[in-house]
Amino acid sequence: MRALYPGSFDPLTLGHLDLIERGCALFGEVVVAVLSNPAKTPAFTLQQRFNQIHVATAHCKGVSVISFDGLTVRCARHNQVDLILRGLRAMSDFEYELQIAHTNRSLAPDFETIFLATAAHHSFLSSSMVKEVARFGGNIDHMVPEVVAQDLHRLFN
């Protein structure tokens, strides 16, 4: 099976990486779909995020990285995946993700969204939080893959 894992990944966290690894173990292949949203100004370019994901997932068989804009279900159909993979950190994530899953299902009834609970030790992580800690010189080594930590240190120093 092929799973689509969409997100901005700005930056990739260890929580994201854990989901990618678990997705590969469960489904065999994970297509990491990096959102290119012209309405947002990301900390890292699309190419930088691609590189971060490629380096961080080099040990994983079955990972591919693509970019997309627009609807997730269009991306899923275009890339011939079987399901959409999402992670849940807390109940607030569940409510938000369930609404998106229902919307996706209304647009493409043949696509399922599978939720995986985030590992407890990653449940506090968010890309926004990581950037904030890095911006103020805090230790982020336990939050992101090494390649991302290096890029964040360069960005904020």
Swiss-Prot record:
Catalytic activity: (R)-4'-phosphopantetheine + ATP + H(+) = 3'-dephospho-CoA + diphosphate
Annotated PANTHER family: PHOSPHOPANTETHEINE ADENYLYLTRANSFERASE (PTHR21342:SF1)
Similarity field: Belongs to the bacterial CoaD family.
InterPro entries: Cyt_trans-like, PPAT, Rossmann-like_a/b/a_fold
Binding site for ATP: S8, F9, H16, G87, L88, R89, E97, H122, S123, F124, L125, S126, S127, S128
Site for Transition state stabilizer, residues: H16
Matches recorded under NCBIfam families: coaD_prev_kdtB, cyt_tran_rel
Species of provenance: Prochlorococcus marinus (strain MIT 9303)
Keywords from the named record: ATP-binding, Coenzyme A biosynthesis, Cytoplasm, Magnesium, Nucleotide-binding, Nucleotidyltransferase, Transferase
SUPFAM superfamilies linked to this entry: Nucleotidylyl transferase (SSF52374)
Enzyme class: transferase
Protein name: Phosphopantetheine adenylyltransferase
GO biological process, one term: coenzyme A biosynthetic process
